[in-house]
């Protein structure tokens, strides 16, 4: 999530910068992006990490650092003294939520309910936040790849309001 929920992530140059950050980090610390959505002030992602390296925190730190180094001068805002002393920028909040999907190997075959719940939560999130009426209308989402692969119908999530368990997305 961005610092003070600044709505900067969907600006075209920042979407490109995020893509570059992900590519750079994936080149150094392999992982697969199973699902992702970039919203104006936060990102949701579902990753598969190597069995021998489940360090998601380092990956997020590197992605955020890469992004911040490239654009921080545009977003210099008022930040706390403690953040200034730590060399932090006014782009990202310090914390993030994570959840380890149970048996992700089955999940990639779309059989694991925990995986599917998170996949659907991610792809429906732009609708949940009132940004679009249907997941297909949100440009910065892996939803389109899933439609191309025949996993989702293009109209999924368009006609009914989906409700998720209160703990999904808050891990």
Write out the residue ranges for each language-model feature.
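Short catalytic/metal-binding and nucleic-acid-binding patches
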Residues: 1-171
């Amino acid at each position: 999530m961005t610092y003070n929920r600044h709505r900067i992530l969907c600006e075209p140059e920042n979407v490109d910068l995020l893509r570059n950050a992900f590519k750079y980090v994936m080149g150094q610390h392999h992982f697969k992006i199973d699902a992702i959505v970039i919203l104006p002030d936060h990102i949701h992602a579902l990753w598969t990490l190597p069995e021998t390296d489940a360090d998601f925190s380092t990956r997020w730190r590197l992605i955020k650092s890469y992004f911040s180094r490239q654009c921080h001068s545009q977003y210099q805002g008022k930040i706390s003294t403690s953040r200034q002393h730590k060399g932090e920028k006014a782009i990202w909040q310090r914390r993030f939520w994570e959840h380890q999907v149970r048996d992700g190997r089955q999940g990639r075959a779309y059989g694991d309910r925990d995986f599917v719940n998170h996949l659907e939560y991610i792809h429906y999130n732009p609708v949940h936040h009132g940004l679009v009426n249907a997941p297909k209308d949100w440009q910065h989402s892996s939803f389109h790849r899933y439609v191309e692969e025949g996993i989702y119908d293009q109209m999924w999530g368009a006609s009914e309001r989906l409700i998720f368990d209160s703990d999904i997305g808050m891990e």
